[in-house]
Amino acid sequence: MSSAETMKQPTAASPDQFSVSHLLSAVESEISAGSEKGDPTERDLKITLEEKPLWDKFNALTNEMIVTKNGRRMFPVLKVNVSGLDPNAMYSFLLDFTAADNHRWKYVNGEWVPGGKPEPSVPSCVYIHPDSPNFGAHWMKSPVSFSKVKLTNKLNGGGQIMLNSLHKYEPRLHIIKVGGPDNQRMVSTHTFPETQFIAVTAYQNEEITALKIKYNPFAKAFLDAKERSDGKDGMEDLQDQPQYSQLGGWFLPGTGPICPPPNPHQFAPSLGLPSHGCDRYSTLRNHRSAPYPHPYQRSSPPTNYGHDTAASLPMMPTHDNWSGLPVSTHNMLSMSAMPHTTTSTHAQYPNLWSVSNNNLTPTTHAQTHMSGTMGTGLPHQFLRTTAPAPYHSIPTCTVPTTASSSPVYHDSHEVSSTDSGYGHSTTPPAPQTRITSNNWSPMTPPSL
């Protein structure tokens, strides 16, 4: 190795020297951050409780702290402001809990009352602040928070504080000066009466619970989760309710027990299926809509009418022994005699139902007009469809009332389209086809 290479070695270490000086300057700035509050003599040491008004609110109601097997953090969090330490000296901050009285507590009739002798005291557990040890300047530059301390009712170690449930405790802060085996000494021990609490496994006072939720940001997250859960339950309850409106009106199940034959007066106003065999379909009767939308397009304010035959039509289940339904001509009343307030502009009789053996088929009025007969098709379950309106208006018609008429038409009378408030076209109306008895085959009810 030449002398020239030996002369270059000191210059190679200059970057390291610059790095060390940079680190030392960072440490010095850290120490000087809280030096303005310092006192090398420690004679003016002051310790004040942070968030004292919040603690006072809890203390007025007798504060409660949850203890669990795995440990639960405190709220409010114990925070203190410290001043008067030696900025260049090293200190450790410790926390323990002492019994506030000599009896056990119980919650009776909305208040805490003494409930007997206390349990034997357990060995006092001490919590060491994770920043310990550190310079006095470090402890004085910002509030010292004990947010990570956990309270438990089981002696499991791990730096947790074990407490007896239903006993009242008071936190106690210790400041110890460190720096060598011979220099350790207790600087101060301080307590705050407003931080007393009763250890519980579940909150007893609802007002304490409300304060915890109001001021604890983590408890607010719990409250939001609970509200979402309640809302979901409410949606599930709504989803569990029968939803038949989207089926388009009539819903006839093709499985399950068959209902007995309905009353021969098929269209009586008060007719309903027998309760002894059709209880399982009671909700369908309550939720189904009218099978025939109204054919009129209203051009003036509606007139109130109390007559509605849609609610009186019974639900007709399929049956193997039914060959047809006898319907007389006087039962097929024109819809102009029974207007009701609706804004539907669909066709008159958008679909009709024919019952033959096990098939119930919807057929449009146009198909009936052209063929004069009912078709067969969809088995068991049916969805009502709509067809375009073949008529612009309904002419005035007069329906005679006879003694043999069905009870539903006992109050039938002549109704004029002008009187009812419905507009009519000046063009001649299209011919209408009325359903007569020859469109239906005789029915023989099965023997019971």
From Swiss-Prot:
> Which GO BP terms sit in this record?
cell fate specification; heart morphogenesis; mesoderm formation; positive regulation of DNA-templated transcription; regulation of transcription by RNA polymerase II
List the record's Gene Ontology CC terms alphabetically: chromatin; nucleus
Give the superkingdom in one word. Eukaryota
Keywords in alphabetical order, please. Developmental protein, DNA-binding, Nucleus, Transcription, Transcription regulation
Primary residence? nucleus
Biased composition regions of type Polar residues, renumbered to the chain = 417-442
Q: Where is this region: Disordered?
A: 290-312, 401-448
Residue ranges for the DNA-binding region feature of this UniProt entry: 54-224
Where does this one sit in the cell?
Nucleus
Report the GO molecular function annotations: DNA-binding transcription factor activity, RNA polymerase II-specific; RNA polymerase II cis-regulatory region sequence-specific DNA binding
**What does this protein do, in the record's words?**
Involved in the transcriptional regulation of genes required for mesoderm formation and differentiation.
Q: Identify this protein by name.
A: T-box transcription factor T homolog 1
